[in-house]
Amino acid sequence: MEGGTDAAAFAAFPSIHAVPSTSGRMVTGSKLDELERIMKSSLHLEEDDFVPELPRSIHPRERPDWEETISAMARGADITVPGEIQIPAELPLRSCGSTASMKVKNVKKLSFTKGHFPKLAECAHFHYENVDFGSIQLTLTEDQNEVNRNGCESKELVFLVQIACQGRSWIVKRSYEDFRVLDKHLHLCIYDRRFSQLSELPRSDSVKDNPELVTQMLMAYLSRLSAIAGNKINCGPALTWMEIDNKGNHLLVHEESSINVPAIAAAHVIKRYNAQAPDELSFEVGDIVSVIDMPPKELTTWWRGKHGFQVGFFPSECVELINDKVPQSMTNSVPKPVSRKHGKLITFLRTFMKSRPSKQKLKQRGILRERVFGCDLGEHLLNSGQDVPQVLRSCTEFIEKHGVVDGIYRLSGIASNIQKLRHEFDSEQIPDLTKDVYIQDIHCVGSLCKLYFRELPNPLLTYQLYEKFSDAVSAASDEERLVKIHDVIQQLPPPHYRTLEFLMRHLSRLATYCSITNMHTKNLAIVWAPNLLRSKQIESACFSGTAAFMEVRIQSVVVEFILNHVEVLFSAKLSSVIREGAGHTSLSRPKSLLVSSPSTKLLSLEEAQARTQAQINSPVVGDSRYIEVGEGPAALQGRFHTVIDFPSERKRPPSKMKKSPVGSWRSFFNIGKSSSSSSMSKRKLQRNPSEPLEMKSMAFAGGRDSSAMRSAKSEESLSSLHAADGESKLFRPRRPRSSSDALSASYNGDLLDSCNRCNSYDNLPRDHDSDGDEGLIHVPAMLSGRSPEDEDLSPPDIGMATLDFDPMSFQCSPHQLDSEGPDNFFQLDIFASNGKDKLQSGTQNPGSVTGCEPLSPFQDKVISPFLSPDRSPSTDKVSKTASFAEKFVQALSPKMGRKAVRSPPLTISDPVSISLPSRVSEMIGSMPGNSAASQSIIWNRESSTNSRESETYYGCKLVDANLSSSSATADPWSTVTPVITCNQDGREDKAGIFTHGFPQPLESSDLEYIENYNLELGTTNVAAAYQNDDTELSRANQNKAHPPNSPQGASASESPQELSHVSSVSIIPPPPPPKNPARMLALALAESAQQASANKKPSFMQFMDLPPPPSVPEDKPLLEFSPKMSPEPLRSGPATPAASPPVISRKTSPATPPSTTSSFSVTTIHHSPVKNYNPLAGQMPTAVTPGLSPSSNQVFASVPDMLHSETIKMNSIIPSEAFTTGIPVTPPTEKTKESSRAPHLHQRSESFPSHPAYSTAKPTPPVRTMDSRLATAMHSNFNDSITANNYHSFLNTMMLPSSLEDALPRHNYSPHLKTGNIDEEGVNYRQTYLSHNKQDDPADLGDLYRQPYISPGKSENAEIGNAYRHPYPSNTESESLKEPLEPFLHHKPAVAPKTYRAETLLPHIPPQVYGSRCDTPSSAFYGTYINQAKHPRSRNKPDYMPSMSPGVRSYTEDTSSYPTIRRVQSLHVPMQTLPPPIRTVPISRTEVPPDDDPAYCPRPLYQYKQCPPFNSQSDYHVTQLQPYFENGRVHYRYSPYSGGPTYFSSDSNFYDMDPYGTLRLRQLPLYPSRDFASYTTRLQPKATYRSQGLPPYPRGTLREHNFISRDVPPALPPEHPRPLHISWDMEDMDRYRLQSLRRENKARQRAKGPVMSQYDNVTPSLVEDVAGLDVIHLRSRSDPGKTPGLLSVAETKDVRYPGRTEGDERTTYPPPVFGNGHQDKPSLPQKQSGSSRSRMQHDISTEQHSQDTLHRQPSEGRNGPPIPPVDYNAKGMPNPPDPTSYHSSANKYNLTQQEPMRLNHKELRLTEDIERSHTRPADNQHRDCYREEQAQFASVVPPPKPERSHSLRAHNPAVLERDPSIFYPYQTLHAKRQSTINTVSQYDNLSDYHSIPHHRTTNQSTPNAFPLPHGRTYSTALGQGAFLAAELALQRPETKIHVE
């Protein structure tokens, strides 16, 4: 097989049979030169080179000189003679080389080797089946010299060969090496030299010296060859060399030609070689010229050809792909390829396929090998002609016969046997499994079978349907689950469906032998699930830990369910019953047509492309959604014009696709999906305004609707070749009906309108003219049997079901959202669909009525669906919604919304399982969690009155009314409602959040802020667009035809919608979105950033632009509803919340939002509803929203700004809401507490019902929701994937407060807040929050701890009681914005810091915001905040931006905006959420600087000054140390908590400033970051965090691992109310100091041991406590920073952030994760060892440590949740590897998602107590145990160790030592668990050390005042404290681990 590679290339493109030869011919001048050289070197023919005709099996490369020749040939480029170029009928024959040469201008030499194309030697070698060209005449032209002159290298001999065939002649340029290649090909494949009498050409080196001799020799050679050349020559490479095809046509591509055939063919294969053309490629195939549109440049990465149009040879893979994927039979059936985009015919492929050698022949020659393993299932079945894979059939038959043995499928076979079998199957042989070897190793057969499925490019259950499956199993009842699963299964591509049925029936039979095999269905499901059901997210690097486990759990639940219901699920009966019941025959299975095969084949090839692209782009949000959708062949379909469309198969004509705005490949994706996916959906939506409700609700009700973002279409296209293509329209509709369909619509840009389609066909009208029936059917399919009467069932199915469903405790619904991460777009699209029409037309033109209207109605509908069970009669239309899904659809669809404007409030009590795009989820999660819960309640109460306001809030809060009513309903999670809510407004840009909540006119400043938020929200917010404007809502509602009532109705509806939104979030978060929330988040961020950059007021501005007047009335009702706030604030609040959700959605939506949302939603809902809502019906929820996502907060801020006077009020409200700073925050605080305490992950869900109970207008619940969301997000999202994309999501999730802060600061509280008047905003933010804190001291831990921060000092004392909370809000001012978020932020502390812009916050809240931003977690969530940053950028807050940059983290320290630092601290707590993203932590750290900006900006150092009165430095806990040098570092340790390194910024964030560390001024998160408000509460009791009033500690002051900071623990005078942390009892402080000293000593002693020093802690801090990273400055005050252990800890701890000091949480860690410990520095290394020991001690004293950690976590409200999880994870799981684990940990309760949870509670309490006493009053209050632990931590830190202790604790160095897996910076929970042992180590010297309440210790002791609350700050500079990093960061930046 000479030139096997060449041939292979041609084989790949049989039609281009001669392609390879071209390359030879393409020899460029250089080749000629080479030839010359060769000839000169020797004229002797090498005898050994002459080979008699050999069997074809001999590959040319096998010959010694073959490679040389072939490569020479490959290098050569033919020179096409312009006049002579003829287009043979079979252009494909042309070799790549020749093509390249042709392309090359004249003699321009193109070296193939030069380009990306493979060398000829690497190309496929093939032979033509039939050759008929008569004879060929080859002669050397007479003007050979010219050739060499033409720029060919003089060394190489190049000859112009004239080839004549069939009366035509042309000239090819060939080098001497090319001649040798030709010779070899001819004699290896065609002639025996004895016959040809052609002697082998000598090596070039032997002849190159004598060019003339060479010429003569070649002339003789060609002469002889011409005599014998004839039809015998069927060798592709040889003919290609001559540039002729098997028919004698000249394979010629004009120089102008863009691509040659091979390249064309390649375009269809994985390698996709194409020449680049401006817009299209002209292929001349045979006599047919096909024009293929070139994909856009961004999509042409796979077009290897450079601008020179080099052509490459195709590797054998290409050949295989082409043959495998497009068998000849398929070729004939392939519909005329039509480029969807340009509609040009692409017949090239068909011709190509026809002309290529038969597959059989290629196989016979060994040229073609079909892949079996790793080949797309549809492709494989197509190629093999089997119903199900032969591997499966053979293995199952064998196993059923011989494999009924114990552990079948569980035990693994012998690898060698498995490989043997695999090879046999791959060789297309059916191995005899009955051989003894296999009989003896039966398990190898089972393993092989699993391996086959594991290696499928697209899993059996397909990536596209993953979310749907996970959503379906989260249904409330078995019946519903059955229907949903059935519905999703029906969406599988036929090959997958058949295979699944076969496999499931087999496994089901096998399960009947469980008594023998011990493999019952559960076990079988466990072993099979990962092979059958995978999500891209799970497979992403970011996905690990808890999230992964949760996903696995989901997978096994799905598989087990299918196994248990095989007969039902795969029976035609059920399908018909469901179809009849649902009234949508569309449920029918797509016809299992191989029909799709034609498209499949091409698609397959493309699919490979798409897959590759998807892998490349999938991280990219923009692209990924499409690619993801089109993961399968369909994806390529839309993407690459070359893809052949299947118009005939697809009911939807291409025109439909054209209709889709996206067009191009997006449209193609739609193609893949049922027609409803894109244009069809839109059309349907438009067409069926009335129908949509039912359909939509159905769709949403259907698990797949909710779960998958992709529309069924998309899925179809992906999975199968559009099973729907062949199917009747009904089928397609049915599929589209599924949420996947809806998602699909949203998925596509044009599908944005489709949101309706997805939700209900209400949107269809707007969406163009999709097939109405399809849309209708499609929805019902999802709902399938649900009827309006089923409303009650529906909501629980989704919301409750998910929550209740244990497997879905992941929160299937959130998972849906998550899964919709990419589908976020879906949500966005839905919103955009609704609003895309609007968003595109109106979103950007907020004023656009159209944009508003559809969404508004939609919103109403959404509400209806969400509240369907409880919907009031008022929702006249909604009442119609039969099933929850239907309701949901209604809610989502604008038309429906209109109808449902008055739809009775769907009570959240019946959870709606709506598949919200991740973004929407995020939006919801960020704000709905809080807002929805609150809103729900409010909505119920103010259904009419607050309708409007509710709507307004909805935008901000998802719906203010909804807050009210939703609060109650949202509690149940009204899971999908939030998403729907977005649609209601119709304004939901991409975020899908409806900002309609902002009814009030937005002032320019507000707009600016909003714009900033918009940036943050990105398009998402734009979608919300501040439909918030009442006018817009009004318009939307009015459009509904209820002008006056409409607003109310809309509001009411919206309220439910919001509720739904919240629910959706809460439900969805549990499972991380397989859709790659990160990607969605990134997309959202990118979009928001772009919008922010491009449009100062992109989305939000636009929304703001919307006339707000109409809204005002609604707002007023809201205001009325929340009497506490003036009407304006309420309005503002509602508006802001509306905006906020989009932001969140955008940011968090992808990954964390779902997760976060879930947790948050639940929690928020808990508190939000009544308590918070009343005063702040919408605002409180907004608070939650902030918690949910930075965007949320931003939204809030923007809305308030927009609402100038109201803004302030709203800001105050929003702060309460967003930060639980709002007026109603207090009540919510209690709820928050509840929520916090409740299992963070999704325990909120349970709370939700309670939440609804809170009819009061206290939206504080949002804070709770945030907690819960954070917890969930942490568990589900963070663990799922903390990718660059997720990172944003995480940021959102963890740092929602940050985002909120960002939002608020960004807002500037724009004119108002920025004006420096925080009175309403800032004060309300802080004071209100404080007040709220006071009010809801117990209830809303998150709020409480936030609120204390909110009020600089005024409520400090009062809050001290609520120290747990207050410490958390140590960033009172800055944090207040963020406070509510903080609990939510717990998971994503990094986010807030990142996003906070000092400028924005500066006025009054910036510090808080910045503080949050400072958080390392924030940096971890840098992306999210980056968006904010972008928005803030509009605010032109340099600080903000810096906080964005991961590397800048350090600079935060030097930034003078200390106030923001405080905020950062708040964020830090949320940062703890970050631990899962710890891997991103480095970035996070880098991003700390952004925190820095915010941290430093606004807050004066006054707080810091308060801190300065540290106790004497004699104590390590010289908390009040202001600037001082320690170990050469200046530590400004003012500190109640800060001790040396800690620094309270005016924003009342703690900043651990490590003078030595790089400006690692990181705000230690107060407790907010902690997912658990309860943590915060418990930890904060003692004011763990500085109070807001405390001046921010200068970074220098903050001492992460500063020598000083460690040595001098920050000690705020206990009397210092602001530094809540300081509220330690003196006794505690003393104890703490003593312990700290002792600890430090021990730690130092141990430093040499396991590298578990505080610095060790630092490392863990990095990992576990991104948010708590500040704790990372593990060096205790006393520790001069020599304790390298600290840094080591950080390193060991998973290097979350290098030596990240508490204060440095954001800024400091940007540097090296470990060694970077600014304060850790070198000392870290030695400390590390101590730290390790310390950690061990820590683990040993795990109870102390854990308790402390828990405590700290709570106290680190923001980071708290993240840290505890990390800690536990550290213990139970490697905390570094598992961001999710961390998340889980972050969830106060689900810290470790293990026993540690319990520990966490307990520890939380203990820690809390300690922290209350030390860091937070509450902490100390809680119990001595924890106090003792805290004291220990302090001890570790020596007197100043409390902070340092925190840091270590956060890092859990001890844990690290014990369990490297416990690297989470926040080892709080994990570490505590693990730390049980480690802690002892660390605590060895601490053992007896009873941490004095850190708070108290702050003054005398170290930052314990601060650290104690962290509970994790335990790490002492000695390296003993392991908790330090995680907890400190979490608890309060101020705590900045001043570990010694």
From Swiss-Prot:
Domain (Rho-GAP) ranges: 375-570
Compositional bias (Basic and acidic residues): 1691-1707, 1736-1755
Signal sequence region: none
Keyword entries, A-Z: Cell membrane, Cytoplasm, GTPase activation, Membrane, SH3 domain
Localization (cell): Cytoplasm; Membrane; Cell membrane
Residues annotated as site: Arginine finger: 410
SUPFAM superfamilies documented for this protein: GTPase activation domain, GAP (SSF48350), PX domain (SSF64268), SH3-domain (SSF50044)
Coiled-coil stretches: none
Disulfide bond positions: none
Keyword Thylakoid: no
Domain PX: residue ranges: 154-248
Biased composition annotated in UniProt, kind: Low complexity: 1081-1094, 1145-1163
Domain SH3: 262-324
Role of this protein: GTPase-activating protein (GAP) promoting GTP hydrolysis on RHOA, CDC42 and RAC1 small GTPases.
Protein name: Rho GTPase-activating protein 32
Lineage: Eukaryota, Metazoa, Chordata, Craniata, Vertebrata
